[in-house]
Every structure is written in structure tokens, then in C-alpha cells.
Amino acid sequence: MTGVQTCALPIFFDDGDTYRVGTMDCIALHTPGHTPACMTHVMGDAAFVGDTLFMPDGGSARADFPGGDAGQLYDSIQKVLSLPGETRLFMCHDYGPNGRDIRWETTVAEEKAHNVHISGKTRDEFIALRTARDKTLDMPKLIIPSLQVNMRGGDLPPPDEDGKRFLKVPINGL
């Protein structure tokens, strides 16, 4: 693209780092809990929350992945919810609970008032709820390949002698 500055990835952010996207000032917020590396990126009146929060009727991300921690997740959610109430929150994904149409945007005010895992709950209540719920969840279907790519910082494995790249999937260990 002409006239657009590009950069070589990866770029690593620390909590509170500021950066620019075009003319927009942005802030990186470290929001661990789902995994240790989770980040929320605030851009103007919008925040991209990754797997920290879901839509209010979906609650929050699981915290039983490697390095996940329900207490950290609660603290991270509180950090996101400390943004102004009108801040638009964009979800990483949505499961459309109870047959609801898929949505991807809510606000801080909506989450505070209606999130089924957060609204009216103390930190200890959230940890108990999240821990109990996580014990009932199956391993995601793509967790093995996802971990292999994530552990390489998003890079795929090196190609074999034929130039093909492979992820390993155990057939008798799950």
C-alpha cells in the first residue's frame, strides 16, 4: 500500500505502552487471566478486549489454559471496566448463547450492568464461579495446534525437506 507506514512484526507491548495507528493514539493494557500474554488495546472510544470478556450474556473467558488464572482474569476485567462507560468493547469471538445472533460489540456500561460472570460478584465469587465452570468445559478442538503456533510467537514450524509445514497432533494422549 502506498503512503502507509509498515513495520516488521512482532511488536511486543508492556502494560500502559502507547502507540499510534495512523493518526489515532492507542494504549496497550496487559489483561492476563485467560492466558498470561492477553492484551487489550484501547483506540479512541473503543477497546479490543481479546479473550478477556465476552458479551454480557456470555460472561468471561475460561482461565484454565496454561498460565491462566481466574484471579488475574477478574483483576483484568476490572481494569477494562474502569474505562469510561461509553467505551465500546469489541470481542474476540462470541458463541451466541441460547441461540442469540452473534454479536461483537458492547460497552463498558453494558458489561458492568449485565455480565453474567461479573455483575454484582466479588473477586472471590468470580474465582469460584470461573473455576467451577472451567472444570466442566471440554478441551477446545484446536487447542493442540493453537498451542504449537502460540508457543512460537505466531510463527509456524519450520518446513520439512519438501517445504511443507506440519503441526503435531497426538493420537493417543488426549
Q: What kind of region is each of these model predictions?
A:
Residues 1-9:
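Short, small-residue-biased leader/transition segments that mark boundaries at the very start
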Residues 4, 48-49, 103:
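Generic alpha-helical secondary structure signal
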Residues 8, 15, 59-61, 104, ...:
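Glycine-rich, flexible loop/turn motifs
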Residues 10-94:
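Catalytic core of the metallo-beta-lactamase
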Residues 75-88, 95-174:
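Accessory terminal helices/loops
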